[in-house]
């Protein structure tokens, strides 16, 4: 019965048995009644012991049975019976390159009936099957996107919500959980929810450069769309004073042409001019570029919204081998 749709034990058992699990709206309290509601007798006649006994003279009603079995005359499509328990998977596509997408994310995409996300990221998720439904929306409609995903999953769909990078880093996992937290809907609560990690832009850029995040570091978004700029300034000041390596997301946009230089002014109060800086643009995508510079030479003209900026700590250093490219790393020791 549908009232038991949220029971994890049923989902686990179905997976272990590799059998479809379907639920049906019914008030029946025994297995035979549920079977009657799910599968018309014309398709699968059955004989139930408790009901057969009910037709014979007796003074007490038959006891309900926990199991009932129907044997159909022909194969029955399980997808046509009742509803499935919906599943919502929030997954990270990684920075963009196909070989940097995790196997778990790829499996979740392959299993999904519906793909939900910002149009650019839905395109990144491809190639997709013709039978998969695509639900694309604007990049700023995160909560609406999350609610739509829950509505689809509540109807028994297998929904993949896609983000670039890691879904838990300035991406859709928080929006999905916020939507669930603010909802009073038993159907949403019954949805099977999963979050699949991905390679974040900061980690992809760091790996391309070497190991600039090899010691303590923090990630800060410079976008003030969802938080006041004063909060951002305070966090930059404390993180820079504590000598964290800093990875800046969303450094510059047309609507925010000056905040990045203001952020650098704060960092420069705590870091030496020769502090190593890594600039990674579109890492993991076609046309990717990587550059190293110093805090003194860095300016807003060198970056855009697609640039990951990593400002090293006081111990971050550059090393070159045989005149080749520089590698950047932050030592694990601290002295």
Where are these regions (language model features)?
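Class I S-adenosyl-L-methionine
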Residues: 2-33, 39, 76-79, 83-98, ...
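General beta-strand structural signal in soluble alpha/beta enzymes
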Residues: 22-25, 54-55, 60, 71, ...
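Short glycine-rich anion-binding loops that position phosphate/pyrophosphate groups of nucleotides
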Residues: 57-58, 62-66, 72-77, 95-98, ...
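C-terminal edge-of-domain segments
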Residues: 40-77, 303-322
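Short beta-strand segments
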Residues: 61, 70-72, 91-92, 161-164, ...
